[in-house]
Amino acid sequence: FVEQAINTYKENYPNTPVLPDDIKKLTAEDFNKYGDIDIFDGSPPCSAFSVSGSMVQGSHSKGWGQTKNYSDGKKVENIEDLFFEFLRVAKDLKPKVIIAENVKGLTVGEAKNYLFKIINTFEEIGYDVSHKVLNSVHYGVPQTRQRTIFIAVREDVTQEIGLTFMNIQSLFPDESKDVVTLEDCLSDIEVDRKEADTLIEKFKKTSHYETWLKMPDDPDKVETGCDYHPKGHHFNMKKTSRHKPAPTITATGGAMHWTEPRPFT
């Protein structure tokens, strides 16, 4: 595991226990020593189903069954199966509620076969489950990010409180019509000019810079690099609009400042 990521998490959540171990090696005992768990919340790795990655709607994903290389030098095979390792731990923990998250791509094309398998596994371990694709932009986040969310309630709990399978869908939060823009959330944040200028100089040395120069300055909407490249390249580079939420920010970046040739600091 990436040591810097673990240290960052500990810095932000100093009172939260951290188990930096392979989930395949974790058992319920590793969690129970911290007390009973009512809600088990997890986000198993999802790159195999990502639309922005190798997933192509309606066709077999090139990412399935492959080896994933991580920045810590480790390799993980069949990363899509880690969802079931998460459910294996949940089965032994027996929490009242399970919350799980994955990419929207899980609900389209051949990935639906995995979705159905996940739902069946929830039911096999004794949970009533419902899923829904939510967009973070509808919940006060200045970023368009769609994710498949699962809510599962242990069967004896649903019977005790009179919650039917159909009513689990009502547990998902209502969407807000109020949209938070980038300007709303960033206008009062002081920019570290040294860091920003370093990023600008670095970006100017890339092939993306010429495309960025062709894009409108301070656009009214998010602009995509491929629309300004003669061969349609740089599709993952997007110039943001301060009047809109950011597009989905991926692990490789791509979301650029609306007036300066740099990603966000």
Regions found by a protein language model. Give the residues of each.
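Core alpha/beta nucleotide-donor-binding catalytic domains of modification enzymes
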Residues: F1-K94, K104-V108, N113
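Short, solvent-exposed loop/turn segments at secondary-structure junctions
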Residues: E3, P45-S47, K104-G105, V137-Y139, ...
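C-terminal target-recognition/interaction regions appended to catalytic cores
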Residues: I200-T265
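Conserved Class I SAM-dependent methyltransferase catalytic core
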Residues: S71-V153
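Bulky hydrophobic/aromatic "packing anchor" residues in well-ordered structure
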Residues: L134, L186, I249-T250
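Short alpha-helical segments and helix-capping/turn motifs at coil-helix boundaries
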Residues: I23-A28, L134-V137, G232-H234
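Flexible, glycine-/basic-rich loop-and-beta segments that form/coincide
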Residues: G140-S207
